[in-house]
Amino acid sequence: AVETGCNVVIEKPMALTLADAEKVVYASLKYRKQVFCVMQNRYSPPSVWIKEMVDSGRLGKIYMVQLNGYWNRDERYYKPGGWHGDAVLDGGTLFTQFSHFIDIMYWLFGDICNIQARFADFNHAGLTAFEDSGFVNFNFVNGGMGSLSYSTSILNRKMESSVLIVPDGGRVKL
C-alpha cells in the first residue's frame, strides 16, 4: 500500500521473517510513507508510567527483567482450517500471543543478545504446527539480563501476564 502513496497500519506481527520485515521498512523509506505496527500496550497507563520511570533513571540500574505469560488457547481458538496454528500464516506463539510483551521489553530496555531458549509442545500437538510453551533467556545489550516464560497450555483461562523489573532502586511488577 505504501507504493500507492498511503501510510499503513499493520496488525501484529509486522512480519514473520526478517526478510519480510526489511521489505516493509525499505518500502516505507523508498516511498516516504509511515508504517505503524499495532502495539497498543505501549499506551496503557502502566506502560507509560514504567517507561517514564525507566527513562528518567528513577529506578536506577536495571539488573533483571522477567516477562511471564501463561494463557489458555485450546481447540476453541485453534480451529482446523483457520490461520491460528498454521506456522506459515500464524508464525507461532511468540508472534501472535506474546509479541506485545516482547515489544514492551524492547521499548523499555533495548536490544538483546546471548539468547538461549527451550521450547515444548505440551497440549497442542495436532492443533498447531509449533510449540505452545517456552523459556527464553538473554542479556540486554545495554546491561542486565532477562527472561521470558510463556505457555498457552494453561487449563480453562488466562492465568498470568506480568513484567517484573529488578533494578538497584527497588522493584516493579506489572
Residue ranges of each PLM-predicted region?
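Predominantly a Rossmann-like dinucleotide-binding segment in NAD(P)-dependent oxidoreductases
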Residues: N41-L127
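Beta-strand-loop-alpha-helix segment that lines the small-molecule cofactor/substrate pocket
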Residues: A1-R42, G57
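Short beta->alpha connector loops of Rossmann-like oxidoreductase domains
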Residues: L16, R73, S162
